[in-house]
Amino acid sequence: MEKRLLDFEVGETVDLFLLIKSSVKGTASNGKPFLSLVLQDKSGELEAKLWDVKESDEANYGVQQIVHLMGDIQNYRGRKQLKIRQIRQATALDGVSASEFMETAPINKEEMADEITQYIFEMKNANLQRITRALLKKYQDDFYDYPAAMRHHHEFVSGLSFHVVSMLRLAKSVADLYPSVNRDLLYAGVILHDLGKVIELSGPVSTTYTLEGNLIGHISIVVEEVSKIADELSIDGEEVVVLKHVLLSHHGKGEWGSPKPPLVREAEILHQIDLMDASLNMMDKVLKHTKPGEFSERVFGLDNRSFYNPIFE
């Protein structure tokens, strides 16, 4: 099987077509311009620097461009980085398209939509069910295409819906173990907690923050959406207030982006399973490319820790 970008080890030479996920111009200590590139294929992404760039290079090696690249995998501060030897734009004769380089969720969109719909169908509280169904219907096209984040966890096509499906399965297990849990409130919180990402982020390809993302953020966005849809459906009362609290508090702490800590049972569960699923996704991503008996590269989103891949099974 042909090796992909993250299959290469430090010291090996890469000769691949890759998609430029991001391209940022900088100035080196010697005063010369360079480009900081993030290059990706279906296996993931790596950073690279293109030194001594000309003005034409900014256009040739911008976001969403496909390039053919030769270079070496190096270790830079505990992380793999690509040192570029040669780079050129791909042409029509190369016969490559952007979709070939984009990581996607391991479950297809139709299966995820069916599973999420089943959880909504199981809700017994009519108000929570109506709000959840209406918001998901309003944004369903983007919801099943968007990543869950720009970086760190589930940052791939359909990553948002895959994150939600994984969390719904965790939520069901918790509710099965603890009968006091309000399933309807928990399921609604899981399905809606990151829905604001479809407004906060630009899309599944070369994802950036939108104006709303930079100035408001996905938590405030989804709470505003809940308020609007509740008004449209003539729903008011405690359910709406508590649902908004569950969504507002799902990051757990003020320093992590939540204006309130979790103050109801389901809010605390949502925070914990969100953190668990995101953390395990980040670990799996690096351990997948770590040999048994070795430590992974450092994971910035997990306190810059390296994780050990045990030899035994």
Curated annotation (Swiss-Prot):
Enzyme class: hydrolase
DNA-binding region(s), residue ranges: 22-90
Coiled coil: none
Signal peptide: none
GO molecular-function terms, A-Z: 3'-5'-RNA exonuclease activity; DNA binding
EC nos: 3.1.-.-
Family statement drawn from the similarity comment of this UniProt entry: Belongs to the YhaM family.
Name of the protein in question: 3'-5' exoribonuclease YhaM
Gene (UniProt): yhaM
